[in-house]
Amino acid sequence: MLKESEDIEGIAIEGPWLEDDISLEEIIKKYYLKIGFQASHIGKAIKIWKHIEEKRKKGDEITVFFGYTSNIVSSGLREIIAYLVKHKKIDIIVTTAGGVEEDFIKCLKPFILGDWEVDGKMLREKGINRIGNIFVPNDRYIAFEEYMMEFFEEILNLQRETGKIITASEFCYKLGEFMDKKLKSKEKEKSILYWAYKNNIPIFCPAITDGSIGDMLYFFKKYNKDEELKIDVANDIVKLNDIAINSKETACIVLGGSLPKHSIINANLFREGTDYAIYVTTALPWDGSLSGAPPEEGVSWGKIGAKADYVEIWGDATIIFPLLVYCVMK
């Protein structure tokens, strides 16, 4: 009934013995790789990212692309990303409009922990928006609008002076510069936009109008009867692809899926794929969506290199990413 088994070698499955004097950090660093299931994927991600960090410290040129969806910034992961940007642990950012605007809004007023099970009609009547179990009152967007109208005026005047339409990445850089001028240091010290501006780390946002920024742009153009102000996304795709092409090695770290994920890995298609990839996602592959596409699918397209070191962690990024960053950076 049982066939004779072959001898196999590898990592023996083992967990921590909690009677030992052991910290949570030691459990994650020493045992996660050996526990199995998604813990082992977290362990592998730590190993890959540590390897990238060690090579960069030695002077190896590895361009780190980092992508995330707007809900990541809605959550407390925003401050962790700002830390990475401040300390130049990532080189290129790709996000959605929400990932830009919510970073700015949080410099003005905080988002509030709410609940998943709340009547939507009641929240609507109270002027409170819900992102999962995070509440965002409308006054946050009103405060944001006041700043954005002034910012759009600056961008329009710059466009008139130079005769040049700014790209979405230049828009994000200028927004960081605008924050530096207008906001107090305490308000901006945990901002992704601010540190990206200070460290000259480009933020690409191919869908810059898909969010509150787009709403504000609509109001600005309608109120001012403006037909001049434009944002160029075409030249950004050249810039993003060229960065990938001209990099000796690349690494792609992506939280979530959608547009940021594909923009990053598609840029790496032009160099026969990235050398390292870490995905953190809850999306499933069964509907053929890009969000759920596993690394192996990226290999088939040439977006992830055939010899790349990669891992996909299936789970909530708000749980996984703080552990991952702490174990790599501390």
From Swiss-Prot:
Residues at the catalytic site: K303 (nucleophile)
Question: Has the keyword NAD been applied to this entry?
Answer: yes
Sorted alphabetically, which keywords does the UniProt record give? Hypusine biosynthesis, NAD, Transferase
One Pfam annotation reads DS
Q: Please give the pathway this protein is involved in.
A: Protein modification; eIF5A hypusination
Give the top-level enzyme category: transferase
GO MF annotation, one: deoxyhypusine synthase activity
A GO CC term assigned to this protein in UniProt = cytoplasm
Q: Name one GO biological process term.
A: spermidine metabolic process
The secretion signal range is none
| Cofactor(s) of this protein | NAD(+)
Catalysed reaction per UniProt? Answer: [eIF5A protein]-L-lysine + spermidine = [eIF5A protein]-deoxyhypusine + propane-1,3-diamine
Entry EC no(s): 2.5.1.46
* Protein family membership: Belongs to the deoxyhypusine synthase family.
HAMAP family given for it? DHS (MF_00153)
Describe its function.
Catalyzes the NAD-dependent oxidative cleavage of spermidine and the subsequent transfer of the butylamine moiety of spermidine to the epsilon-amino group of a specific lysine residue of the eIF-5A precursor protein to form the intermediate deoxyhypusine residue.
- The name of this protein is Probable deoxyhypusine synthase
Which species expresses this protein natively? Methanocaldococcus jannaschii (strain ATCC 43067 / DSM 2661 / JAL-1 / JCM 10045 / NBRC 100440) (Methanococcus jannaschii)
Q: What is the lineage of its organism?
A: Archaea, Methanobacteriati, Methanobacteriota, Methanomada group, Methanococci
Gene giving rise to this polypeptide: dys
